[in-house]
Amino acid sequence: MNFRDKAIILKKRNIKENLAIVTVLTQSYGIYSGIIKDLHSKKNTIIYQIGNIVDFCWSARLDEHLGTINCELVKSYSYLIMSNKRNLLYTHSLIELTLMSFKERELHANLFEKWLENLESINTGNINVKNYINFELLILKEAGYRLNLDRCGVTNCTQNLIYVSPKSGQAISATVGEPYKHKLLLLPKFLVHNNCEPEDIYEIQAAFNLTAYFFNKYILIKKKLPITRELLLKSILEYSF
């Protein structure tokens, strides 16, 4: 068995002096892992870095085997990721959530395209809170837990959406939600309107709380959110506004 595809390097784990297991997100086959040999060669040291886009080749005698991989570098983002603390936390938090949320060998084409989009945002210096939270919302959606934030789940109206139901994941308008607001999650304005950015640190905190609630409820269960996510939020709150 073998195939070739475009892929993004997500993880590398050394298992012997010159061997490692590398995990990638492929465009057409989902998350895949395999063994790389000659780990410390000059070429492989450059290729197998987190965030790099590669031409990925996987081969194994049987499909259920771990297999071996061979890659050629297509585009490197590793320097941009490693040279900036915010970029590093941003990327590693999303990698960990991706690996926690999806099984290997499940196709998620939208997820791959979102990863490409965000790597290019890092390249152009355009990463921000809105991009990050929208990525988390996409992960939830691809995992089968879409939040419906564009209209009220009770009245179907699209105005004054300021809450989210923790049960249904649907937006709730101010009028409908007022009697139950102590039981509802806050919905930041910038997640409803495309032309809005976070107004203050409270909106940022509310956005992180919103997605965290549904990750904990549906995906992580007894696992914990990545520590890199916590550090990213701390970094954002310290240096924003």
Curated annotation (Swiss-Prot):
Q: Which gene encodes it?
A: recO
**Top-level taxonomy:** Bacteria, Pseudomonadati, Pseudomonadota, Alphaproteobacteria, Rickettsiales
Stored Pfam families:
RecO_C, RecO_N
Q: Name one GO cellular component term.
A: bacterial nucleoid
Q: Which InterPro entries match?
A: ARFGAP/RecO, DNA_rep/recomb_RecO_N, NA-bd_OB-fold, RecO, RecO_C
Which PANTHER family does the UniProt entry name for this protein? DNA REPAIR PROTEIN RECO (PTHR33991:SF1)
Family to which the UniProt record says this protein belongs:
Belongs to the RecO family.
The organism's superkingdom is given as Bacteria
Q: Which UniProt keywords apply?
A: DNA damage, DNA recombination, DNA repair
Q: Which residues form the signal peptide?
A: none
Q: Which SUPFAM superfamilies does the annotation name? A: ArfGap/RecO-like zinc finger, Nucleic acid-binding proteins
Q: Does the keyword Hydrolase apply?
A: no
List GO BP terms, alphabetically.
DNA recombination; double-strand break repair
Write the protein's name: DNA repair protein RecO
The task this protein performs is described as: Involved in DNA repair and RecF pathway recombination.
Source organism of the structure: Orientia tsutsugamushi (strain Ikeda) (Rickettsia tsutsugamushi)
